[in-house]
């Protein structure tokens, strides 16, 4: 199609070297438009993408998700999902951000009727930010107390009945004397151990009781409220947000420099922990337990759903950071290479993190003389704040050092992720209101993030975290990612999109990308989303079901996020009438005059390129012997010949 939003001058179009005065004046005015800040260099962008995509999801979430969904066999659906959904979505978001030099909302000048996708993703991002910062607060708390002469979770308090010390000798002595730890069926954070006989009293480790009674002061019923914020965790939450603000206050100028540390330091610690872990007794059993495939799970649709959820969570697609980071690139930056590096590194890091974690859990099972490693594995926060601290307390040499390294690594990983999420929100606001100072918006949004995070440092905070993550994070992000892909590929058109990529990257789009974007990726995502909705069950925390009011609040949260798409679409149609409502709706499905490269000179070159492509296809259509069906099929698959 011929572009009419911005036309080349007569001189440019005719090739005679002349331009009219009106075109010159317009060009000069456009040249005075402030340009977007760019990364200091391409490596800053790559490091920033690594810092957000290689985060807590790799070291924390992936090991347990893989273990619960087939062990080593989970890698097969995960890698398939990575190549058919993860990589295509990641590359697409990089392209959209770099091509337009705009954030998550402004990119929808490509299909203005889909602007609600950007606002909905912003809502989902805010939900994730709200609870993510509370995890940083917990991590900071454990980091601070790790400097004590004795790890505070390694021994029991007098008021804790049925408690077993996490310190190694006492633990083993208790086990050998016939007192064992039982897996508490009523709790997600179960006690470690086995039952010697039916009358054996159920015991809990000191690391578990420390987390539940000292750190979060957990409530097992939130029907009467969540309680008041804990002052220690509140201070840790405040410290986390101060660090976040300092990193993002100058935009990519400051976050780009911090990205080197945020991306590389965790690998240093992870390799140190890996070397230590694989040398521990029982490590081999833990690693084999993690990698041992359960082939029957491959036929379970839930496993494939979890692979998609893990892929989205790990790569941070569908929530805006990748688009935002890419928008600060130079227009000709080689993003294809970066997309391949980050997505591959993300998978390798997940595997590395899983081996490290399960090697240490294997050592924990060995020390406790427990044959089934399943009894020492926990999900969610229990893995990071119960199982791992419990294992560290049994290290014979300087357990404090390894505790500090582990929790500092978690904190850095978390900061890398939340910096990207928070910067996404700040960029959306600054794109919308050009006159606002970036640091002021960063300060205000950081203060709001701190206030929202207070609910998660209450005794009922883990309940709220589970609720918001399930309804406001996972499902909102997933459904809007489907609309995101559909808007670009099916409404704007894959052929147009491939032309834009060819112009920007100076390379043809391969069949792999075209087939993924046009068919495999959207179809798989739609099928998995429908399956998730059909098989959805009431959520639980610590094996306890949420109150009915909490479930209603969760569905309301999901509805608010998902409703952003149609509501903002209707708003755009009402604000841009084209006669009848049907004509206005059709107009909202076409690119606005703002769509295209931000730089005026690049934009004019792009218009010429697109019009040349349109004329070329019109000529080919006249002489082509292909039937109507085959022409439509090649257009659908984005053939840019």
Curated annotation (Swiss-Prot):
Composition bias type Basic and acidic residues, residue spans: 25-35
Superkingdom of origin organism: Eukaryota
GO biological process: amino acid import across plasma membrane; D-amino acid transport; neutral amino acid transport; sodium ion transport
Region named Disordered: 1-36
Pfam name, any one: SNF
Record function comment: Unusual broad substrate spectrum amino acid:sodium cotransporter that promotes absorption of the D isomers of essential amino acids. Neutral amino acids are the preferred substrates, especially methionine and phenylalanine.
Comp. bias intervals (Low complexity): 9-24
Annotated glycosylation sites: 183, 188
Family (UniProt): Belongs to the sodium:neurotransmitter symporter (SNF) (TC 2.A.22) family.
Transmembrane segments annotated in the record for this chain: 39-59, 72-92, 109-129, 229-249, 258-278, 307-327, 341-361, 401-421, 441-461, 474-494, 516-536, 552-572
Keywords: Amino-acid transport, Glycoprotein, Ion transport, Membrane, Sodium, Sodium transport, Symport, Transmembrane, Transmembrane helix, Transport
Location of the protein in the cell: Membrane
Species the sequence originates in: Drosophila erecta (Fruit fly)
Membrane protein topology class: Multi-pass membrane protein
Stretches of the chain found on the membrane's Cytoplasmic side: 1-38
Any one cellular-component term (Gene Ontology): plasma membrane
A single MF term (Gene Ontology): amino acid:sodium symporter activity
Protein name (database record): Sodium-dependent nutrient amino acid transporter 1
